[in-house]
Curated annotation (Swiss-Prot):
Phylogenetic placement of the source organism: Bacteria, Bacillati, Actinomycetota, Actinomycetes, Pseudonocardiales
Cofactor requirements of the protein: Mg(2+)
Record keyword Phosphoprotein present: yes
Active site: S102 (phosphoserine intermediate)
GO biological process: carbohydrate metabolic process; peptidoglycan biosynthetic process; UDP-N-acetylglucosamine biosynthetic process
Post-translational modification: Activated by phosphorylation.
Reactions accelerated catalytically: alpha-D-glucosamine 1-phosphate = D-glucosamine 6-phosphate
UniProt GO cellular component terms: cytosol
Keywords (A to Z) from UniProt: Isomerase, Magnesium, Metal-binding, Phosphoprotein
UniProt EC number: 5.4.2.10
Protein name: Phosphoglucosamine mutase
UniProt-listed Pfam families: PGM_PMM_I, PGM_PMM_II, PGM_PMM_III, PGM_PMM_IV
Cofactor: how bound: Binds 1 Mg(2+) ion per subunit.
Length: 444
């Protein structure tokens, strides 16, 4: 049986897979689990959401579940996921609930839980919550029923935190920001203006239906055109819940998460802020990042794909920078999860501090051509473990040498094997990936 909680919480088609009944049950079970760990005081939960239409329905259900279990609720409204994580810590809440499906299409939604301090809940606690969804319990009555109230200044509290974490004024910088008609629209343009930048905001009018609709960090063409049209210094793109940030330089070229991490790692190393001179990233990061960091004396720690694995490595090793190629960047000295706005402010600050363009800074690393082929198979474990596949991978690695890389990994949700090849030339990467994909597909 699959887990209710995936790598990023509970997700599904809102009102079909993720129903109000399920949302209420998850929230109520979460509150009960917290109480049983310490029933000495009344619990407080903080609830936020992105602007998609189903968020209001699910927010009401989550609030009902929490209060019915005796927890008080602080409703912060539409805010980014990292804002909710920060406010859980800043307002000393016992639990955080973010209602969002991040970069997914509008009809989807999700529930992500944060522990006290703003960190993601451990798998074991999520599993305990899932196991107790249907249990019959005596509910509190009278004064023991939880109360709910709004927090009108939640957004400004988060913006103040961002500005404290990024002291470099951005005066003279012109930036275009694509808010994806999502949670970033509530705070990103104002935060960047307060930091001193001239801001042109795109897709900052969410109506509940237009979130991620051909815009944001997964659709960069509009941002690239706007940067050139407005002669901006750079562009920034967020996803629906603003835990990601990708960038575009003045020419319209994309600067991905690997390049952003390279820029920040070099800056932090120079300032003595890069703990153990180490950057944490995933196996999908481009080989160009590895080569560039080696040149700058930065060590890399590599994890499985997923920001939860990056976060775990950062916490375990006490490191100060990590992230993913997709634009999830984590700065643990200032945030407990990926924060697209904090990343953007730090990136813009580096541009102003150095007086160099984003294109010049991004040249810190050279992206090697990367080819990814998804191969449908009968059994992904059999395909990945086949001796002939292992032999072919070893031969490909020997052929590429230090100037390329091969990675085969099974999909976490489908019967697919992902074949990734990097090489100095696009043609070589395509040829090697095609050869391996053909072999993997033939495994029975």
């Amino acid at each position: 049986m699959s887990r209710l909680f995936g790598t990023d919480g509970v997700r599904g088609l809102a009102n079909a897979d993720l129903t109000p009944e399920l949302a209420l049950s998850v929230a109520s079970a979460a509150a009960r689990v917290l109480y049983e760990r310490d029933d000495s005081r009344r619990r407080v939960a903080l609830v936020g959401r992105d602007p998609r239409a189903s968020g209001e329905m699910l927010e009401a259900a989550v609030t009902a579940g929490l209060t019915s279990a005796g927890a008080d609720v602080l409703r912060v409204g539409v805010l980014p996921t990292p804002a909710v994580a920060h406010l859980v810590s800043a307002m000393r809440a016992d639990l955080g609930v973010m209602i969002s499906a991040s970069h997914n299409p509008m009809p989807d939604n999700g529930i992500k839980l944060f522990a006290a301090g703003g960190h993601k809940l451990p798998d074991a606690v999520e599993d305990e919550i899932a196991d107790r969804l249907d249990e019959r319990v005596d509910r509190p009555t009278g004064a023991a029923v939880g109360r709910a109230r709004d927090v009108p200044d939640a957004g400004s509290r988060y913006v103040d935190h961002l500005l404290e974490a990024t002291p470099q004024p951005l005066d003279g910088l012109r930036v275009v920001v694509d808010c994806a008609n999502g949670a970033a629209a509530a705070v990103a343009p104002s935060a960047y203006r307060l930091a001193g930048a001239e801001v042109i905001a795109l897709n900052a009018e969410p109506d509940g239906l237009n979130i991620n609709e051909g815009v944001g960090s997964t659709h960069l063409d509009g941002l690239r055109a706007a940067v050139r049209e407005h002669r901006a210094d750079l562009g920034l793109a967020h996803d629906g819940d603003a835990d990601r940030c990708l960038a575009v330089d003045a020419t319209g070229s994309v600067v991905d998460g690997d390049q952003i991490m390279a820029i920040l790692a070099v800056a932090m190393k120079e300032a003595g802020e890069l703990a153990d001179d180490t950057l944490v990233t995933t196996v999908m990061s481009n080989l160009g990042l590895h080569l560039a960091m080696r040149e700058h004396g930065v060590k890399l720690r590599t994890t499985a794909v997923g920001d939860r694995y990056v976060l775990a490595e950062l916490r375990e090793g006490g490191f100060s920078l990590g992230g993913e190629q997709s634009g999830h960047v984590v700065l643990p000295d200032h945030a407990t999860t990926g924060d697209g706005l904090l990343t953007a402010l730090r990136l813009m600050g580096r541009v102003v501090e150095t007086g160099r363009s984003l294109a010049e800074l991004a040249a810190t690393m050279t992206r090697l051509p990367q080819v990814l082929v998804n191969v449908r198979v009968a059994d992904k474990a059999t395909a990945c473990g086949a001796p002939e596949v292992a032999k072919a991978v070893a031969e490909a690695e020997a052929e590429l040498g230090d100037e390329g890389r091969v990675l085969l990994r099974p999909s976490g949700t489908e019967q697919l094997v992902r074949v990734m090849v990097e090489a100095r030339s696009e043609g070589t990467a395509q040829r090697v990936a095609g050869r391996l994909a053909e072999l993997v597909a033939a495994i029975r």
